[in-house]
Amino acid sequence: MEHIAADLLLKGLAPEGFADGQPIGLVTTDSREVCPGCIFVAFPGERFDGHDFAAKALEEGAAYVVLNHPVEGVPAEKAVISPDSYHAMMVMGANYRSQFHPKVVGVTGSVGKTTTKQMTYAAIAGFGDTIKTEGNQNNELGLPRTLFRIGKETEYAVVEMGMSHAGEIERLARCARPDVGIITCIGVSHIGNLGSQENICKAKLEICAGLAEGSPLVLNGDDPFLRKAALPGHVRPVWFSLGDESADVCALNVRQEGDGMAFTLCDRAAGRYEVTIPAMGRHNVANALAAYAAATRLGLAPEGVIAGLADFEQTGMRQKVVHAGGMDVIEDCYNANPDSMKAALAMFREYPCKRCFALLGDMLELGEMSASAHEELGRQAAGAGLTALVTYGPEAARTAEAAKAAGLADVVHAGDYQQAADALLARMKAGDALLVKASRGMALEKALALFYPVCGK
């Protein structure tokens, strides 16, 4: 974080004249990070309440503290009162971002946000100093933290925007003010909160609130909800598609090559290019098209963008291929929903191996559609060419039963991680491949931690 005058950073939070021009070099929510000249933002929590550390933060040199309410021992002239700590972070993030002028790409969508963010970063990073959202910092706390990493030398920023409820993307977009927006697709994540995919589409389109007149909005032309959506008149839609040559950017001759994909990219504004990406599945080709469209609509050269995509690196447990004991394990257990499960199984069906196995766990936050979604997953698994399916989790029990009913002979529902690992170890051998996928809360990496030592990783 570059130093910024306190009165500029706190504009809209503190009364006019409250803060002086003292330079602030850090905004933190962690009392252990407090240093002279910082602002400490107190968050109430289940285990710790940041308000309990406010007075100590001032003793250690904090210039100001942001509180939900007055705290004994904290002078009024040092306390910025904001009933909502998240709102305070967003205001300061927006104020800080307004002092710098990098080109910003905002990424949202039901599926593929993080991969598309990573691909966009890879596409852009070779053109200048670039920052991106790290980890899952895609909410009203994480986005300001990302913006605070912008510096004087930063030329580009790629920020991910997540949501659980309507209105959240709008607040994030107004804070980040992206130059280009991306909506990857409209799925069913958080449908329990929003009620329908139409409402999810409206929520994702809130990214337009942060886009200026004429700004490009990169959209999935293969998504029926986006295709029929009423787009705001101030944005310029840029459509991408797998196969539709009428789209602004499309992919033809899509094929798997080793652990990645190859395709012909057709850009109506720039011509045709042969592209390879180190990520499997047609869905990742779509993510690459979105990244390419965003980067080139910033004015970056297609050849450099394509070279960057070839160096893309997947993060965390997102379709990471691990070679263990002569077997390939595709770790894709960072998150899951019906759309990403379907895409993963489609990718896995084409995977070059002797036999294919899958360990699938619960998809969380599906509300009333959870039962039907897990049953449909079982039917999809039965049609995916698997040798055997192992499931874990209470909802995944429905997946196991549906897979059996659909004709998959070898199905095991594991009661714990050890049972899951044992079921796989008893069946798999060198030359086989395993797909591991579930929502983050299922922690399927714990089953892999029991699987790997035995199979020889």
Regions found by a protein language model. Give the residues of each.
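ATP-dependent carboxylate/acyl-activation modules
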Residues: 107, 316-318, 441-449
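Residue-level signal for inorganic ion chemistry
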Residues: 38, 57, 92, 107, ...
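A short acidic, helix-capping loop that chelates divalent metal ions and anchors anionic groups
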Residues: 188-194, 330, 363-367, 436
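Acidic, Mg2+-coordinating active-site environments of NTP-dependent enzymes
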Residues: 67, 71-76, 182-328, 353-354, ...
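N-terminal leader/targeting and accessory segments in enzymes
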Residues: 1-91, 351-353, 379-380, 384-394
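Short acidic-hydrophobic, aromatic-tinged amphipathic segments that line or gate anion-handling sites
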Residues: 79-84, 411-420
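Phosphate-binding loop of NTP-binding sites
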Residues: 11, 88-221, 225-233, 426, ...
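Active-site beta-alpha connecting loops in nucleotide-dependent enzymes
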Residues: 45-48, 315, 333-407, 455-457
